Amino acid sequence: MREGVNKVALCLFEHNEKAYRAAIRMMDQYGKAAIAHSTGTGKSYIAFKLIEDNPEKVVIWLSPSEYIFKTQLESLKRNDSDFPLVNVHFYTYAKLMCCTQTQLEEIAAQKPAYLILDEFHRAGAECWGESTVALLKLCQDAKLLGLTETNIRYLDKNRDMAEELLDGHIAGDMNLGEAVVRGILPAPKYVTTVYQYQKALAKYQARVDNLRTPGIQDANQKYLDALRRTLEQADGLDRVFAHHITNKSGKYIVFCANKEHMDEMVSHVPEWFTGVNPDVVVYEAYSDDPNTDKAFADFKTDISDRLKLLFCIDMLNEGVHVEGISGVILFRPTISPIIYKQQIGRALTAGDTAAPLILDVVNNFEGLTSISGLQSEMQEAVHRLYANGEGDKIVTERFEVIEQVHDCRILFERLQENLSSSWEHYFSEASIYYAEHGNLNIPKLYTTPSGLSLGVWLVT
């Protein structure tokens, strides 16, 4: 029981309880700890547990957005409306960036016992990092607890933010694959397909056209033509959705790249989704829209028989979970591994048992293999658990992946392999020329003794 309140103390999932205890030990020893747990595993409750266990201590909570913190609080209040938050002060990383030195000193003057860095990999952003580090220097007596799905900034030279901000003290580390293997998150039904692939075909046609050796060009053109024919014969999105969206009145989050992209996708709703349910309602949520709060709230409370689609841009990537989601639909270009995992993670929530649907709809062929990263994580987790004598913790070793365009992926991989070997062939000839002549000042029309148009290759 919580002291002075007729309430039972917060009860963490086993994986979070273990990480919390390790974090307490690390903070006592080093003053800082990081927890890198997959999206959907409830890691914000680790921070709430820290607050509950230290009700008299001042806590400063830093987060990428007010929206994330607000939804985390909503989830907490559903479980415990009297949770003690009087000593918790919330700021966004963006707010810190706008603070003067005096304002940062005023924040530090609250003398926090703890600083919680939520989604702390985001503090590595150039615009946010400096002010965050400045505040940490002003709060040197505070213990630091960092929460993230991954501490690596993949598109920023693989910077390790746990190392930079928390001296590499990681109290808990569990990626999405391990969370699924251990049954903490439900295994999804994963469907891949492509749409609007004409630009991608044109890009590869240009690469094939630039191959000046007839034999090599002809071989690659055959693969590309076969890929084009296979794509033309594949089911359209209307058939894919009608077949795989089995909960006809379910709630689905639809991720888009930007506002223009979202508007275009929404315009296709009648064409693509009427075969699922002719009664479709569309909600839209994006950070610059003042109506977002209402749209999001209406989506969450909608219990009608309509098919409910929440189209959104980036704001639901991290930290925000919606109960009762039947699945997610990703309309996406190539994105970072972090955002990809966060988006598919919106369909996965600890404690759920039903297999959620993930429809991965890509406009580039490279995206067809994205799921292999998660599958590799799962295989590594299975091997590690068996090796550690923890085979009893394995609940799921694999999940269903339905490739609507399986043949396309195989043809694309062969085309990629062929184009790469062609490049290596040209590179090898260029290396030979350089070794013989000491430079690559090759006339554009120069061909090698074997017939390669090396001059043209070098200028293209």
Where are these regions (language model features)?
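Walker A/P-loop
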Residues: Q29-K49
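Conserved Walker A/P-loop ATP-binding site and its immediately adjacent core
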Residues: S44-K49, D53-L76, A257-E260
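SF2 helicase catalytic motif II
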Residues: I107-G146, I152
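Interdomain helical connector at the RecA1-RecA2 junction of SF1/SF2 helicase-like NTPases
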Residues: D156-Y252, V266, P270
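Conserved helicase ATPase core of P-loop NTP-dependent helicases/translocases
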Residues: V280-I313
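Conserved SF2 helicase motif VI
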Residues: S336-D352
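Conserved segment of the helicase C-terminal RecA-like domain
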Residues: A347-G373
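IQ-motif-like calmodulin-binding regions
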Residues: I402-T460
